[in-house]
Amino acid sequence: MSQLLVAKVLCMVGVFFFMLLGSLLPVKVIEADFEKAHRSKKVLSLCNTFGGGVFLATCFNALLPAVRDKLQQVLSLGHISTDYPLAETLMMVGFFLTVFVEQLVLTFRRERPPFIDLETFNAGSDAGSDSEYESPFVGVGGRNHGLYPEPTAHSHGTGLRLRELGRPGPLRLLSLVFALSAHSVFEGLALGLQEEGERVVSLFVGVAVHETLVAVALGISMARSAVPLRDAAKLAVTVSAMIPVGIGLGLGIESARSVASSVASALLQGLAGGTFLFVTFLEILAKELEERSEQLLKVLFLVLGYAVLAGMVFLKW
């Protein structure tokens, strides 16, 4: 078994357990404590911004060069030469496809939240308000007993209503898994399709940071919404398996070693790059940098995240 294959298998196992622990630990240990939630939100917000910097470097320093190299190999097989920026165009197609899928899912769910983000800690606060913690996690007076109160005319919060997810029904569960994991499969594909060890390591760090934070946000949401542990475990296992599934698909495509597999690899890596763009700019930076608290510190963590991954690519781990 080659070292590259071993690295990818370890990535599959690592991401799965990071996400599983991140989503289940809050269900077990977090109580409905406002001050604890306040502190957790600030720490995770900084980690999320650091993850945004990691994803920037992953996208532009690791994944984009890989897509260019793969496309060049495919074009050389057909003796085709062009100066058109095919890699960049493919990534933008992936970006628009991810936006379309997200909006399609949310349209059918008749809701307006993003897939999952740290606004789960801030549901119900007015957009751009000075305080990120104006609305409590648990409603007062018995009306709103979950993390997410009913929306009002003056409420701009967009948290994911995980209270409904504990109810039985395969269609509801399928809708949830698709909403949370559509882009996770493409992140896994990007890992599985890589042919160089240092790019696998760079992508793994970026994916692990982001998806672990996603899992923690999901776990805290389930804890606040009193989702039963058994249902939370089923949900956590299902969501955590999405990136390993993507890695496995990528491994299968890459191992075929044919012209068709090379074309598929180039196309899928380009589309996966668009998913990374979506996560970086619309899920992380757009939401973290619009808040008025700790803005300069968040910029510092953004630069640090980028520098760490850019340095790893430069040193060719």
Swiss-Prot record:
GO terms for molecular function: zinc ion transmembrane transporter activity. The chain crosses the membrane at residues 4-24, 43-63, 86-106, 173-193, 200-220, 233-253, 266-286, 295-315. It is a multi-pass membrane protein. Keywords: Cell membrane, Ion transport, Membrane, Phosphoprotein, Transmembrane, Transmembrane helix, Transport, Zinc, Zinc transport. It comes from the Eukaryota. Residues 25-42, 107-172, 221-232, 287-294 are cytoplasmic. It catalyses: Zn(2+)(in) = Zn(2+)(out). One of its GO terms (biological process) is embryonic cranial skeleton morphogenesis. The modification Phosphoserine is found at residues 125, 129. Its main location: membrane. GO terms for cellular component: apical plasma membrane; hippocampal mossy fiber to CA3 synapse; plasma membrane. Residues 1-3, 64-85, 194-199, 254-265, 316-317 are extracellular. It is found in: Cell membrane; Apical cell membrane. Transporter for the divalent cation Zn(2+). Mediates the influx of Zn(2+) into cells from extracellular space. Controls Zn(2+) accumulation into dentate gyrus granule cells in the hippocampus. Mediates Zn(2+) reuptake from the secreted milk within the alveolar lumen. Belongs to the ZIP transporter (TC 2.A.5) family. This is Zinc transporter ZIP3. The gene is Slc39a3.
